[in-house]
């Protein structure tokens, strides 16, 4: 025990567990009504099948369901794979026209034919050239 340096307004009571078999009535938790063992046994069977209707203090002899608190449950993040993102378009007309660079892919097919008696089985080569133009 620590030495007290002033007046102590709290009562010093020994801590006794509610389910202590050596103390029939703990200091701070006295049962409201005495029930027969048959009723207690019936309540234990019902507590496994019927959820409790209130979150108030229940008798300590009832078997309780393990209900984890929400802070201990992991909630996966929402997945938006099915939805495609729609870009936002500024609908306010501005006074100055803006130039947007556009990139177009131009394909040119070049077939190289040589004067040879062999048969060429390879497909013609395809070259892709990027052309960038600015539209005003």
Curated annotation (Swiss-Prot):
Pfam families: Casein_kappa
InterPro entries xrefs: Casein_kappa (IPR000117)
Protein name: Kappa-casein
Keyword terms of this UniProt record: Glycoprotein, Milk protein, Phosphoprotein, Secreted
Chief location of this protein within or outside the cell: secreted
Residue positions the entry lists as glycosylated: 88, 98-99, 103, 109, 116, 132
Residues with Phosphothreonine modification: 112
UniProt subcellular location: Secreted
Any one cellular-component term (Gene Ontology): extracellular space
Function: Kappa-casein stabilizes micelle formation, preventing casein precipitation in milk.
Gene Ontology biological process: lactation; protein stabilization
